[in-house]
């Protein structure tokens, strides 16, 4: 069993590396040369205050990877298959409990594929804003598709007599839109008060209180998400950079989160399962003003260009 779990963990790690590599890609022109994102112009509005650090154009490679690659689909299918197999074993081994068993899942980029929202931003030359996202949550349920493997996993959860609890940072104000998306995708939700936990405030991103609420109602045996904060806040939430933070601060905070992820190794592939998301997440709060300085060093040097022979 340890060998199986260890191999599952290694496969998942490979998926996350693939996702990270995709996130490093920049738009590629017809000549194949990399181009940086264009500066804001009258036609291209400046980034909103609540927008992520990377501009949309710098995320293009990651979005293309998520929307078009078979590798991403294979990753998600593999992770959900591993989670289903592990849950089957947990249920078989689990002693009787007064509280019903539950699996806690995030929604966006864990169950819901929101590629349509990303496409909307690109086609309209827009950056992310909370207001645009709220409109998408509320009014565009039919644009939402499924993350590969999610529906089959949820069906297995029900088959095993376990309750899937959806814990998301979508707005409670837009609950009807989220329920409509779930219905559109054919995902069963019982009593929303017991199985769908959304955030009340637009500024609330910490899930700890809601996780504790769920733990009071259920015997939670598994968590699934696409962001480390879907598993624990204290260890994985990125700290806010102090004013004037330099490269050293960003490197230290990145290493802290990486170390915490390594410390949680006994959870990965056992009761915590994470899906790749190279488009957005806690990680992109720490890219700093010079992302290239955070990348692995290299000993390679560009070849010298020899002058043309006359």
Task: Report each predicted region and the residues it spans.
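Conserved phosphoryl-transfer catalytic core
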Residues: 126-138
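Bacterial N-terminal signal peptides that target proteins for export
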Residues: 2-12
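Non-catalytic pre-domain segments flanking phosphatase-related domains
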Residues: 23-105, 287-310
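Asp-based phosphoryl-transfer active-site loop
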Residues: 103-113
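C-terminal cap/substrate-recognition subdomain and adjoining C-terminal extension
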Residues: 171, 175-310
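Bacterial N-terminal signal peptides
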Residues: 10-24
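Substrate-recognition element of Asp-dependent hydrolases with the DxDx(T/V) motif
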Residues: 109, 150-182, 226
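Second-shell loop/turn segments in exported
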Residues: 65-74, 138-144, 165-171, 200-201
């Amino acid at each position: 069993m340890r060998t199986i779990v260890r191999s599952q963990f290694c496969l998942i790690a490979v998926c996350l590396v693939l996702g990270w590599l995709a996130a490093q890609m920049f738009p590629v022109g017809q000549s194949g040369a990399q181009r940086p994102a264009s500066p804001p112009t009258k036609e291209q509005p400046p980034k909103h205050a609540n927008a992520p650090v990377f501009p949309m154009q710098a995320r293009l490679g990651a979005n293309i990877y998520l929307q078009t690659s078979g590798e991403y689909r294979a990753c998600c299918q593999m992770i959900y298959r591993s989670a289903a197999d592990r849950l089957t074993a947990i249920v078989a081994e689990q002693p009787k409990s007064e509280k019903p068993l539950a699996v806690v899942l995030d929604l966006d980029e864990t169950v819901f594929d929101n590629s349509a929202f990303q496409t909307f931003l690109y086609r309209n030359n827009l950056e992310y804003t909370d207001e645009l996202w709220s409109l998408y949550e509320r009014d565009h349920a039919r644009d939402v598709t499924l993350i590969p493997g999610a529906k089959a996993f949820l069906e297995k959860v029900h088959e095993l007599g376990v309750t899937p609890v959806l814990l998301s940072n979508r707005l409670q104000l837009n609950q009807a839109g989220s329920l409509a998306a779930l219905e559109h995708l054919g995902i069963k939700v019982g009593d929303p008060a017991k199985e769908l936990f959304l955030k009340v405030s637009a500024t609330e991103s910490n899930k700890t209180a809601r996780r504790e609420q769920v733990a009071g109602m259920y015997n939670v045996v598994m968590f699934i998400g696409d962001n480390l904060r879907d598993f624990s806040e204290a260890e994985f939430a990125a700290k806010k950079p102090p004013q004037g933070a330099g490269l050293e601060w960003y490197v230290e905070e990145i290493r802290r989160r990486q170390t915490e992820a390594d410390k949680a190794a006994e959870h990965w592939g056992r009761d915590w399962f994470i899906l790749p998301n190279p488009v957005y997440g806690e990680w992109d709060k720490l890219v700093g003003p010079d992302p290239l300085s955070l990348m692995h060093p290299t000993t390679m040097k560009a070849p010298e260009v020899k002058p043309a022979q006359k």
